[in-house]
Amino acid sequence: EELVLLFFAFNFMELDDYEDNMSKYLDDYMISHQNDTPEQIASLKNLFTETLDKCVDVFGRDSVFKNISTHRKRQSLYLYDLLMWSFSQYTKEQIGNKQDAIKQALQETCNDIGFKKSLSGRVMRKSGIKTRRTIWEEKLKVILS
């Protein structure tokens, strides 16, 4: 449930409003959406499901949200945030059959020195999130634009 909430908060609230306090940020999102209509809720559910499907289509159910540049078997919160945030901005048609190029770009991103530095300390710091998004989005735009 918290991961779903994280997806919505990071997609619909300004990252600049995030003060490195995840609980407060998620609470603020919940408060601002406590009166959503059933139609709005259905739309949000659809967005989440479609975005997750795009991630799984590209990386596979067993590999999605795992750092493919390492041998770690666990899914990573920072990759969940990064991929769900970025894939929500593109349609299935834009992603198309570019899975191999996207996987290669993610591997390059995960090996990037700046990206690796953004993972030191608390992974979900605003500065780290911004750094990772910038590095990843530069590579993804080349493929999907």
Describe the predicted segments one by one.
Residues 1-145:
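Flexible coil/loop and intrinsically disordered segments
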